[in-house]
Amino acid sequence: MERPPGLRPGAGGPWEMRERLGTGGFGNVSLYQHRELDLKIAIKSCRLELSSKNRERWCHEIQIMKKLDHANVVKACDVPEELNFLINDVPLLAMEYCSGGDLRKLLNKPENCCGLKESQILSLLSDIGSGIRYLHENKIIHRDLKPENIVLQDVGGKTIHKIIDLGYAKDVDQGSLCTSFVGTLQYLAPELFENKPYTATVDYWSFGTMVFECIAGYRPFLHHLQPFTWHEKIKKKDPKCIFACEEMTGEVRFSSHLPQPNSLCSLIVEPMESWLQLMLNWDPQQRGGPIDLTLKQPRCFALMDHILNLKIVHILNMTSAKIISFLLPCDESLHSLQSRIERETGINTGSQELLSETGISLDPRKPASQCVLDGVRGCDSYMVYLFDKSKTVYEGPFASRSLSDCVNYIVQDSKIQLPIIQLRKVWAEAVHYVSGLKEDYSRLFQGQRAAMLSLLRYNANLTKMKNTLISASQQLKAKLEFFRKSIQLDLERYSEQMTYGISSEKMLKAWKEMEEKAIHYSEVGVIGYLEDQIMSLHTEIMELQKSPYGRRQGDLMESLEQRAIDLYKQLKHRPPDHLYSDSTEMVKIIVHTVQSQDRVLKELFGHLSKLLGCKQKIIDLLPKVEVALSNIKEADNTVMFMQGKRQKEIWHLLKIACTQSSARSLVGSSLEGTVTPPVSAWLPPTLADREHPLTCVVTPQDGETLAQMIEENLNCLGHLSTIIREANEDQSSSLMSLDWSWLAE
């Protein structure tokens, strides 16, 4: 293993150097790992003999680093005891290790040749802007901000950017300032480059240059030229100019706008251009803008915060494959947003269905801010999908994204010879175009997936309702079976006693009507036809889930993207003597990718139409299931009501019978000298020997109650005796003379 100069073998103890992370003007940064604890730290060591002044500044850097504590500034830590020694008469600096590499490594990836994604740009703007603000508040000017001095660390799945190498060791005597920044002059503020006095605004220039490069893929001002050359051409630029390029004629073209292509959505471009105009102002006194008296900070920070606080909803219109973006006021309702969507797309608000990536429909009762996630920025990070509910067939595919002028130029004539330097720019845009086609498909596939998840939610709801329906149907069937058997038994028993006991035509008619209703309600519980339709839909959904078109089909496009990247890499590494080349191979890849996208989009929209058609069937079927369930519940309630009503009637009959039986017993016991014919004497001769059906009713035996009843009715005994005698004389008298009007209740 490689060791820092002066480190004796074994002197590091359990700490082992794993790799060299970087080399600066005066020092090396190496990764050390603890063999047992799996701890990792970055150690910065001096690799040169320093003058006393520079040695003092090195030590000063270490002291300052240990005082800093901010999430976006790399933290210093204690040097392990085993490594705590002097190298070249200066101490080591231990820092937290960031495993994501530096920003330069990210920018050098061929897929980022035309800039980073919007989410990455905004994340960098937030992190490094916060870090610079912290340093400036602590009276620290970095002076050497560049992609190599921005490291990335993954924290809970989120990339955090941190500033490293505060540059104190590079603050050498003013006479050799430029030479101390060898290799980093492209990001230096003009006043540093020209060896003039400077303020904190030098960091604004460097930061603006970095952000521009992250947006476009290259630096803002004549990026292919050395600073000594482009400074003379740029220093008289307009304050609003943020971009300069050299035309084929050699003329320099200035612009106050960001170049295309880039990944920023249209709503961010304008405020970002305004921010860059503040950061890239040549005049250090004007750079960053005036101090905001309310916020007590330069306008550039206020504008940066404004950009980062913008709530923008990105909506993919699945009917046109176009992305539309809206800036959301904090209190906007979803209905208001849908009205804006209607004006933009022509899709009526009532026909709009907005789905999240998980297939959940947006809640119309909640504000429009539900379309954006807290802390998530960029159209590449989160999308809402718009569907037209009035359509179930999405024709697709749609026209591919437009070619840039450069790419269109080589597509029209792939054999034209272009200078390698110019070709690099053209091929970079070609790679960006091919990657864009793949990303367009990926977004549409995600929209199809949201539609599938929505379908599965509808299907789950249908399944739940089906189970409820089947359960209710089975319960109704069981209750009807019980009701029919019980009413049949009641009718049979009623028929047996009506000739000598209690009878009522109204009650009999009511009971028979109940029996007929029960027969009718048995038809309500028949749901087989609905079960068949539901099972058919379940089968259809299962087939859609199994379909290969329900899975990602972009393998060929990814392969073509990689081929385009490989071609671009080869072009970048061509030796200088290869001055010209054609674009035949790159154009083949472009054409093949367009054809591949056309094919997979046809398959995607065909499958999507089936999903939406199936979902519409569920939507049409759900009301039928609800009606059937409502009818079953209504029938169930009616059956239970009829059963209860009949039971009340039976108990009312029993009450009457008990009352009559009690009355007879009381009269018989109080008229000891009176000849009272037995009950059998009241009945017709043919029935006199038969047992009365109500003789099983027990006469009340409570002594106190009977005594009270007798006392209360003494005055009525004479009248009752008369009635009984008349009954004995008139054998034809019966209980039919009683009032049965209660049956009509």
Curated annotation (Swiss-Prot):
PTM per Swiss-Prot/TrEMBL: Ubiquitinated by TRIM56 via 'Lys-63'-linked ubiquitination, promoting activation of CHUK/IKKA. Phosphorylated by MAP3K14/NIK, AKT and to a lesser extent by MEKK1, and dephosphorylated by PP2A. Autophosphorylated.
UniProt key word Hydrolase: no
GO molecular function: ATP binding; IkappaB kinase activity; protein heterodimerization activity; protein homodimerization activity; protein kinase activity; protein serine/threonine kinase activity; scaffold protein binding
Residue list for modification Phosphothreonine: T23
Pfam assignment, any one: Pkinase
Tissue specificity as recorded in UniProt: Ubiquitous only for isoform 1, isoforms 2 and 3 are expressed predominantly in brain and T-lymphocytes.
Protein family per UniProt: Belongs to the protein kinase superfamily. Ser/Thr protein kinase family. I-kappa-B kinase subfamily.
Listed name of the protein: Inhibitor of nuclear factor kappa-B kinase subunit alpha
